[in-house]
Amino acid sequence: TKKNLPQCLVICDDMADTGVMHQATNILATCFIRGRHLGLSTWLSVQKLSTIHPVARANFQFILCWELRNRKELFDGILFELSNIHSVDMLFELYKMATEDPHSFLYVNLRRKPVEFYVRFEEKLVID
């Protein structure tokens, strides 16, 4: 019989200045690459997507994006990162819909095929 692994969650908040976010051969990248095989989930909270190493970004299961103050970060970071899923224009419209209310955010479920977009966790955004 298959034995279930114990589950563990690691939450890292705003570690961009530590240097650990920028290296492919660090414990944080290992958490993303091998963690799921060990029953480990890793959540990152960052102000800039570009501070996360591409190896970690390639293993994201979801993205939560609140309203950003900087359009460059929005377009060069979030929207460009997701541009293989939909056009940047479409992604920008989804972002605007999801973040128009105070404290609201765009939830992108990258585990679903096709990828799903939500306003918070409440309202699914349907793309025609």
Predicted regions located by residue number:
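Conserved P-loop NTPase motor cores
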Residues: T1-D89
